């Protein structure tokens, strides 16, 4: 029954899409200087695919990346590694945000509930994933520069100074530059749009094994 529901759900997702699919590469860099004087730096990339009702993120991993294995040298995701999963956000027929984690290597899809999303530190904010930065927040920011198809926004709160370069046509953030006022941390996100009108990856897991996040517990 769960398999049938999954197939029907994926079919619904595919049939409602109308807009072209957007593909982009997102580069994320962050740095934090701890109170102990140690600097922690994180740099990674993701591929993003998007249409009006679906957003898909997948981490760019090294070519020789080894998936988790058990004693018999077979893939094992008993303890889920989020870096190995693709994140498929989509709007259901009630326009509520849903999230599936997809393990292409294992041909498995994990259906997350709201409590699972919160526990994993993920988001269920549709505008945040669709536009990479919450478009509702952008509207409250000060415009500092306008160019050919883009707008620079800026704001400051008690902790951070935030600059956003916004793609007006595609409704997403091209650059997100966040610098703490005390100079101890920053994060920089850059989005490079590569192409449109491609085959979306979420059309390819309708026959995958369906699981719940609880299936990965101890």
Model-inferred region functions:
Residues 114-146:
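Flexible, surface-exposed loop/linker segments and immediately adjacent secondary-structure boundaries
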Residues 19-21, 144-150, 157-162, 169-218:
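Non-transmembrane domains of secretory- and envelope-associated proteins
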Residues 41, 46-126:
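An acidic-aromatic
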Residues 45-50, 89-92, 139-146, 164-166:
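Short, exposed beta-strand/loop patches in secreted or surface proteins that constitute
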Residues 17-54, 60-62, 211-218:
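N-terminal cleavable signal peptides for secretion/export
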Residues 18-27, 52-58, 76, 97-98, ...:
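Short, hydrophobic/aromatic-rich segments at coil-to-beta transitions
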Residues 13-15:
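N-terminal signal peptide c-region/cleavage motif recognized by signal peptidases
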Residues 1-4:
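Positively charged n-region of N-terminal signal peptides that target proteins for export
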């Amino acid at each position: 029954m769960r398999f049938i529901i999954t197939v029907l759900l994926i079919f619904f997702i595919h049939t409602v899409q109308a807009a072209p699919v957007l593909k982009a590469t997102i580069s994320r860099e962050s740095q934090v200087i701890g109170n102990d004087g140690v600097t922690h730096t994180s740099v990674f990339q993701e591929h993003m695919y998007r249409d009006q009702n679906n957003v898909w993120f997948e981490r760019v991993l090294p070519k020789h990346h080894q998936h988790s294995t058990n004693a018999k040298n077979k893939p094992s995701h008993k303890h889920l590694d989020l870096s190995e999963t693709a994140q498929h956000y989509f709007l259901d027929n009630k326009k509520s945000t849903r999230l599936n984690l997809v393990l292409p290597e294992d041909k498995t899809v994990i259906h997350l509930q709201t409590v699972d999303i919160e526990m994993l530190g993920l988001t269920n904010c549709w505008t945040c994933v669709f536009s990479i930065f919450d478009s509702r927040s952008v509207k409250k920011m000060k415009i500092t520069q306008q160019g050919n198809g883009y707008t620079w926004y800026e704001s400051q709160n008690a902790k951070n100074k935030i600059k956003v370069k916004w793609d007006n046509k595609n409704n997403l953030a091209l650059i997100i530059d966040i610098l703490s006022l005390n100079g101890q941390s920053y994060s920089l996100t850059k989005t490079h749009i590569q192409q449109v009108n491609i085959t979306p990856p979420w059309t390819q897991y309708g026959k995958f094994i369906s699981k719940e996040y609880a299936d990965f517990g101890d």
